[in-house]
């Protein structure tokens, strides 16, 4: 924690092609070793693949996919009297988006397609259709929260 008070939260600049902060954040999430140009190229090619396959606007498909991935509930560990409980808590909107983007990129990387463009495009398309590993992660997170509903009164 800084001694000089709270650190101001930086706002990302919108992406130049789609004029969207979400796209900028996805580019930053995908970036490895500071290679932003490469990350941008991969994302734009993925969006081209999505547009080609669906015929719809890639941005709309991406937003729908993200909506299907973002969790509403998650569990946090809380120590009470020597026992650790998994306490279900609601996810803040900012964290929802962050988790959604993180899961999208992570599960796209784990896919078996040859190029990252194809992997990302297919993961976005799967998520838009409510299938795929990222959506399964959200479902698992919700199941954990549901299973531990009995400990909800330990919320802080």
Curated annotation (Swiss-Prot):
GO terms for biological process: translation. Keywords: Ribonucleoprotein, Ribosomal protein, RNA-binding, rRNA-binding, tRNA-binding. InterPro entries: Ribosomal_uS7, Ribosomal_uS7_bac/org-type, Ribosomal_uS7_CS, Ribosomal_uS7_dom, Ribosomal_uS7_dom_sf. GO terms for molecular function: rRNA binding; structural constituent of ribosome; tRNA binding. GO terms for cellular component: small ribosomal subunit. It holds the Pfam family Ribosomal_S7. One of the primary rRNA binding proteins, it binds directly to 16S rRNA where it nucleates assembly of the head domain of the 30S subunit. Is located at the subunit interface close to the decoding center, probably blocks exit of the E-site tRNA. Belongs to the universal ribosomal protein uS7 family. Part of the 30S ribosomal subunit. Contacts proteins S9 and S11. This is Small ribosomal subunit protein uS7. It comes from Bacillus velezensis (strain DSM 23117 / BGSC 10A6 / LMG 26770 / FZB42) (Bacillus amyloliquefaciens subsp. plantarum).
């Amino acid at each position: 924690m800084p001694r000089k008070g709270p650190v101001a939260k930086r706002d990302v600049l919108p992406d130049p092609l789609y004029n969207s902060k979400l796209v900028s954040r996805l580019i930053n999430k995908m970036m490895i070793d500071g290679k932003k140009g490469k990350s941008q190229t991969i994302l734009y090619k993925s969006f081209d693949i999505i547009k080609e396959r669906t015929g719809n606007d890639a941005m709309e498909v991406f937003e729908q996919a993200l909506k299907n991935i973002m969790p509403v509930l998650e569990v946090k560990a809380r120590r009470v009297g020597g026992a650790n409980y998994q306490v279900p808590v609601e996810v803040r909107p900012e964290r929802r988006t962050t988790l959604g983007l993180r899961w999208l990129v992570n599960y796209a990387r784990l896919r078996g397609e040859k190029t990252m463009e194809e992997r990302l495009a297919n993961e976005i398309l799967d998520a838009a259709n409510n299938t795929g590993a990222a959506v399964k992660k959200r479902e698992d997170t919700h199941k954990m929260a549901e299973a531990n509903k009995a400990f909800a009164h330990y919320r802080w």
